Amino acid sequence: MKVELFDFDLPERLIAQVPLKERDASRLMVLDKKTGEITHSTFKHVIDFLNAGDCIVLNDTRVLPARLYGVKEETGAKVEVLLLKQEEGDVWETLVKPAKRVKRGTVLSFGDGRLTAVCTEELEHGGRKIEFRYEGIFYEVLESLGEMPLPPYIKEQLDDRERYQTVYSKKQGSAAAPTAGLHFTEEILDALREKGVHIAFITLHVGLGTFRPVSAENVEEHDMHAEFYEMSEETAALLNRVRQEGGRIISVGTTSTRTLETIASEHDGRFREASGWTSIFIYPGYTFRAIDGMITNFHLPKSSLIMLVSALAGREHVLSAYRTAVEHEYRFFSFGDAMLIK
């Protein structure tokens, strides 16, 4: 299957550069995956499309302020360090710019020495393993010194970094937000509970690979990045009960979808307490074992994310919906509008 099949024309002006003032003011396109029929709404009315007994599944990961600006202690030369993955203790896999300035043994300093680091290993493509040294709690130091690693297509500064976090974010570890969840407010979550809609949480720490373009010519040749996930026993039990009682499982975002499908595919369509690394790549032809629908944002042309959405709703339905979204000037990507596939 050719990657070109997932291309579409997107005017640059429709790429949302800043979040809306109110989270739930985003528009909501509702797509019927069987018929391709479209309904236009707003996110604050998402409750109207969910039934008592359904379950939405949210990713409670929290984005790290993972971009650090510092200097080499020896020369004062400026360096930028992007945290990718915690290895062991205070050792992290990072991306360093300019990489040539940082060799094994190089000592770096951030925030007037409040945080220092030594390079322990050189990796390919500008990657470096770095061991941090600090006083106190690492994540508190990082909160005070780090900046949010916004996606490459967002050029504006983010005034309020909490707007790149979901209201239910808890577990530190992501390099990017699970953006479908950015539309939810505490009021919407309360209203869903009041209606009898179950709310379940999983964790998947989003890696920067989520922004990596599909460079292969054929979809099947794409090498999917791996991300860490976990599901609690409580969530697994709830999802199994919802399934047994005939409710729908609606994942919020591609990250929740990939977590649920990873676990269900390994346990014959059922859910269990689990954690590990997933590199599941979902594209048309995939048979879903976990979800009945999903809430997601509007994705980049030819991305692995639009392929996942097409696997659920059908490529032609999705591309037709995206053309309609462009015509109606929906906002695209991380700070953009939402789609409910049901």
UniProtKB/Swiss-Prot annotation:
Q: Which reaction does it catalyse?
A: 7-aminomethyl-7-carbaguanosine(34) in tRNA + S-adenosyl-L-methionine = epoxyqueuosine(34) in tRNA + adenine + L-methionine + 2 H(+)
Pfam families in the cross-refs: Queuosine_synth
Name the pathway.
tRNA modification; tRNA-queuosine biosynthesis
Q: What class of enzyme is it?
A: transferase
Cite the entry's keywords alphabetically: Cytoplasm, Queuosine biosynthesis, S-adenosyl-L-methionine, Transferase
Q: Can you say where in the cell this protein is located?
A: Cytoplasm
GO molecular function terms listed in the Swiss-Prot or TrEMBL record: S-adenosylmethionine:tRNA ribosyltransferase-isomerase activity
Domain of life, source organism: Bacteria
Q: Which GO terms describe its cellular component?
A: cytoplasm
What Gene Ontology biological process does one annotation of this record name?
A: tRNA wobble guanine modification
Q: Does Cytoplasm show up as a keyword for this record?
A: yes
EC number(s) recorded for this UniProt protein: 2.4.99.17
Tell me the protein family, please.
Answer: Belongs to the QueA family.
Protein role: Transfers and isomerizes the ribose moiety from AdoMet to the 7-aminomethyl group of 7-deazaguanine (preQ1-tRNA) to give epoxyqueuosine (oQ-tRNA).
Q: Which PANTHER family match?
A: S-ADENOSYLMETHIONINE:TRNA RIBOSYLTRANSFERASE-ISOMERASE (PTHR30307:SF0)
User: How is this protein named in the record?
Assistant: S-adenosylmethionine:tRNA ribosyltransferase-isomerase
Q: Which organism is it from?
A: Bacillus licheniformis (strain ATCC 14580 / DSM 13 / JCM 2505 / CCUG 7422 / NBRC 12200 / NCIMB 9375 / NCTC 10341 / NRRL NRS-1264 / Gibson 46)
